[in-house]
């Protein structure tokens, strides 16, 4: 997917990118590839692949939750790595107020450079572990309209890291590959215990490929019990069963 195809694929979904926004994506790609030579940010570096599997893939969250396109929502991205999905969403929908949490200082440093280079406002970067970011005494607990994660961790683990940050009435949007139905089945208990309820799963295929993606939207219907999230490392070591 080259930049023009990227722009057209989004236009097909009613999302229009200006020349300025397209330039922001071009600058994002450039800095990502340059920084990746000395900081491990991504194994995907070929231009067309980045536009498809990072930029386009990130924005598909808006296909599942159209409010991202126009409402002044607060969005928290847990473990964003090189900024996915939150920064492509922010470029496409500048009214979003974005908070990014990542546990690696090198990634936060890259994101600081990137946000400055792209001239983005309304972006807060926090160096922290997810478990302490939304712990029971944290000012960020249950504060966000939308919490996103695009990570390889199982849904039962991601839910414990993400649902505590979503406000009651908010949503957790999980970006998953093709194993989503299986993960939903295994993660059902965790989602319920953490105050969530699965609203829907939107399944799509990345254009020009047979790669399946699943966007899982989980409503936060009640407050998360104070004992969650558990201490760092425990959610992945002993997922809620």
Swiss-Prot record:
It is found in: Cytoplasm. Gene3D superfamilies: Vaccinia Virus protein VP39. It is an enzyme of class 2 (transferase). It comes from the Bacteria. It holds the Pfam family GidB. Keywords: Cytoplasm, Methyltransferase, rRNA processing, S-adenosyl-L-methionine, Transferase. NCBIfam families: rsmG_gidB (TIGR00138). Specifically methylates the N7 position of a guanine in 16S rRNA. This is Ribosomal RNA small subunit methyltransferase G. It comes from Limosilactobacillus reuteri (strain DSM 20016) (Lactobacillus reuteri). The lineage of its organism: Bacteria, Bacillati, Bacillota, Bacilli, Lactobacillales.
């Amino acid at each position: 997917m080259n930049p023009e195809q990227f722009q057209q694929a989004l236009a097909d979904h009613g999302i229009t990118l200006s020349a300025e926004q397209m330039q922001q994506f071009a600058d994002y790609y450039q800095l990502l590839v340059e920084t990746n030579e000395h900081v491990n940010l991504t194994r995907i570096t070929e231009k067309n692949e980045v536009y498809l599997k990072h930029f386009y893939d990130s924005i598909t969250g808006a296909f599942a939750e159209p409010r991202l396109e126009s409402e002044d929502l607060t969005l928290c991205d847990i473990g964003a790595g090189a900024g996915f999905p939150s920064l492509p969403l922010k470029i496409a929908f500048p009214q979003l107020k974005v908070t990014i949490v990542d546990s690696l200082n090198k990634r936060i440093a890259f994101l600081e450079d990137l946000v400055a280079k792209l001239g983005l406002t309304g972006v807060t970067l926090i160096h922290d572990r997810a478990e302490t970011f939304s712990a029971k005494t944290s000012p960020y607990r249950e504060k966000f309209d939308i919490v996103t994660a695009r990570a390889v961790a199982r849904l039962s683990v991601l839910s414990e890291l993400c649902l505590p940050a979503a406000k009651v009435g908010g949503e957790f949007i999980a970006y998953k590959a093709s194993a989503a139905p299986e993960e939903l089945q295994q993660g059902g208990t965790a989602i319920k215990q953490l105050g969530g309820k699965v609203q829907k799963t939107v399944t799509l295929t990345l254009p020009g490929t047979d790669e399946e993606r699943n966007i899982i939207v989980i409503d936060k219907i009640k407050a998360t019990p104070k004992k969650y999230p558990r201490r760092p490392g425990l959610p992945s070591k002993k997922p809620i069963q």
